[in-house]
Curated annotation (Swiss-Prot):
Name assigned to this protein: 1-deoxy-D-xylulose-5-phosphate synthase
UniProt binding sites for thiamine diphosphate: H80, G121, H122, S123, G153, A154, N181, Y288, E370
Bound cofactor: record note: Binds 1 Mg(2+) ion per subunit. Binds 1 thiamine pyrophosphate per subunit.
SUPFAM superfamilies in the cross-refs: Thiamin diphosphate-binding fold (THDP-binding) (SSF52518), TK C-terminal domain-like (SSF52922)
Pathway assigned in UniProt: Metabolic intermediate biosynthesis; 1-deoxy-D-xylulose 5-phosphate biosynthesis; 1-deoxy-D-xylulose 5-phosphate from D-glyceraldehyde 3-phosphate and pyruvate: step 1/1
InterPro entries recorded: Dxylulose-5-P_synthase (IPR005477), THDP-binding (IPR029061), Transketo_C/PFOR_II (IPR009014), Transketolase-like_Pyr-bd (IPR005475), Transketolase_BS (IPR020826), Transketolase_C (IPR033248), Transketolase_CS (IPR049557)
Alphabetized GO MF terms: 1-deoxy-D-xylulose-5-phosphate synthase activity; magnesium ion binding; thiamine pyrophosphate binding
Annotated keywords: Isoprene biosynthesis, Magnesium, Metal-binding, Thiamine biosynthesis, Thiamine pyrophosphate, Transferase
Originating organism: Shewanella sp. (strain W3-18-1)
Positions of Mg(2+) binding: D152, N181
Similarity field: Belongs to the transketolase family. DXPS subfamily.
Gene from which this protein is expressed: dxs
GO terms for cellular component: cytosol
Function text: Catalyzes the acyloin condensation reaction between C atoms 2 and 3 of pyruvate and glyceraldehyde 3-phosphate to yield 1-deoxy-D-xylulose-5-phosphate (DXP).
Amino acid sequence: MSLDISQFPVLAQANTPNELRQLPQALLPQVADELREFLLKSVGMSSGHFASGLGTVELTVALHYVYNTPFDRLIWDVGHQAYPHKILTGRRDKMHTIRQKNGLHPFPWREESEYDTFSVGHSGTSISAALAMAVAAEKEQAGRKVVAVIGDGAMTGGMVFEAMNHAGDLHNDMLVVLNDNEMSISENVGALNNHLAQLMSGRFYTTLREGGKKVLKGMPVIKEMAKRTEEHLKGMVVPGTLFEELGFNYIGPIDGHDVDALVETMRNMRNLKGPQVLHIMTKKGRGYEPAEKDPIGWHAVPKFDPTQFKKPSTTPGLPTFSQVFGKWLCDIAEQDDKVLGITPAMREGSGMVEFSQRFPKQYFDAAIAEQHAVTLGAGFACEGYKPVVAIYSTFLQRGYDQLIHDVALQRLPVLFAIDRGGIVGADGPTHQGAFDLSFMRCIPNMVIMAPSDENECRQMLYTGYCYNAGPSAVRYPRGSATGATQVEAMTALPIGKGVIKRVGKRIALLNFGTTLASALTAADNLDATVVDMRFVKPLDAELVTEMAQTHDILVTVEENAIMGGAGSGVLELLQKLKMPKPVLQIGLPDEFIKHGSPEEVTHDLQLDAEGILAQINAYLAQ
């Protein structure tokens, strides 16, 4: 159910950016207030990303007010902060459907709206895309402006600086808005700084600056003195030296919650030549006290009542696989101070909060820099340490070359704890862990494990810790564990060996990972054999051979892309052994998996017990 827009009288007049631009500037503060209230109530009704959007309300209003979107290109980095953008671009009546099956996409998405000029979900991509659009705009001579909005967290990624270095060299007209919500230099935010930012972005100052360069071109000593004078003036209020060195003109920082200051500064900057950076200071969770105090805890929320000023209480349930990993990491660190935990800015999501607090000297947050995180682990392994890189499946894609070149090629014993393997649900195609088994399986020297439950996960992590002949990976899903009895004692599993879980006839299900329970349920209806394969690489060739010799049909089950996945490994083995055998591969299809709840997505892809049974029966009927 959508909100009653009559409760928001000014926002009701701005369903599109064009309507927003018809309003007098004096009404923009009220637009921002109503937009924030709408967002608060909307996310409370539907669930979704929360704190980031509250922090970008004034910025979003100012951008769409000053720039002629969608003709002017606006690119959001990652997209957590883009809910206000969706509300102002004709989608407010559908906001209650966001992240839900057949509802609005969780991030800016080109197929959804012409205002979403670039589909996003991973951090650090916006400036590269914006640069390309700026170059295209110059080629077309259409007068189009280009703006990228990026957070301070994403600025830690190497791709960002690669793009800025290139943009500084090409010198096309573009604006990068640095949304800094860490408040690291908050003492510089205020009336004086806003005034100086507007002054430095104004036509008089920039004309004087460019004219001065021409006049002083042949007078290097005076030119250097003038440059230092300007740097001294700017240095009083801006930390922009790095951006200037990359070839950007830097303005700021200014208060990102002062919509009038944002509008005036952006108007001044809109027609500046060359690449520009506008540094704004914002606060995540702005306008909602609990989110301001705990922006990480309120990053994404379930449905809640905003008037209660707290998230709904949840009854303690089964531990998540992330928590199982976190406990194992603490347990092993108690025994071995050579164990090092590495995460690319996913401490909370990966279950490493307790580890970071109890073992701070063994904990390394590499920031949003997956390539660096992987090679950091490689370097530690070279020095005799036991690095454990905790990383989401979808983000390991970003460190693939490092996994091959820096880890596997050197046979370094780095353990990868791969979270969010398989279907993740509401975050959609940018975050589904669909490809890791496929892209790791082809790498020489890798050992890849897929636990069927939390106890097996714990033992596999220990197996990877004990394995010193090369890199290893334990791949587990998002969400709650299965309820298996936890065995505190840690025992290394024999490498490349599976176990038979059910003995049946004719059909053998070779299961990889936490789909085991569904495979067993389906097998009960078929009187089929079920094998918990455990290892994707190396495969248990002896067990696969036995199943092929004693059964008419093999069925592989995995929550990974069928193409190149564990099932493909079984087929390759059978072909190598010259054992022709019908094999049905059950897994993720050759398409990007859309958003929805994990249960909905699993059902639609026929990966639950009912779906597995249906796929097998359909195969038998052919």
